């Protein structure tokens, strides 16, 4: 391939040739921080109570944070990894507090509890305020336009307690 700099648009060009020195064989998919069975049970209990979908993959934990990585994730030892998969939530006092990332990767029909918010309720929700609405107790998704998840709420006694991340409020 010939690239003539005076004929192509762009600020520069880069070309590289990679040479495979040896056959690597099978990839070691062992993950040193795989979550223990108890952590997986806590997540599955949350899933049964609050979601209509079952997520499959490899559960990975970094401290109290639980992630769902693809099944074929390679060995992460020695690699700085921002997020090895979907951030499911944080394990606190033997239960899962769901992460905003989990809510954003699901569809409206994947939640057992939903609340379609009006424009005014959505503005209040995004400011961090609670919304008053009758709903079964537990975690659910606040929806925009009845279809698009905006974030989590926890329903208790007719009040949808806001679980919208503080760093997104405004």
Place the predicted regions along the sequence by residue.
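Core SAM-dependent methyltransferase catalytic element
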Residues: 1-30
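Polybasic, low-complexity RNA-engagement segments
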Residues: 21-170
């Amino acid at each position: 391939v010939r690239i003539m700099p005076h004929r192509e648009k762009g600020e520069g060009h880069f070309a590289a040739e990679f040479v495979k020195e040896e056959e690597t064989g099978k990839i070691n998919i062992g993950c040193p921080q795989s979550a223990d069975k108890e952590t997986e049970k806590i997540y599955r209990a949350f899933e049964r109570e609050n979601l209509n979908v079952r997520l499959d993959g490899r559960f990975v934990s970094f401290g109290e944070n639980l992630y769902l990585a693809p099944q074929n994730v390679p060995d992460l030892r020695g690699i700085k990894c921002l997020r090895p998969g979907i951030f499911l939530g944080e394990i606190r006092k033997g239960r899962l507090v769901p992460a905003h990332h989990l809510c954003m990767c699901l569809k409206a029909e994947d939640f057992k509890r939903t609340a379609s918010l009006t424009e005014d309720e959505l503005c209040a929700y995004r400011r961090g305020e609670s919304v008053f609405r009758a709903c079964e107790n537990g975690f659910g998704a606040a929806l925009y336009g009845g279809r698009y998840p905006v974030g989590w709420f926890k329903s208790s006694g007719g009040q949808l307690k806001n679980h919208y991340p503080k760093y997104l409020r405004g």
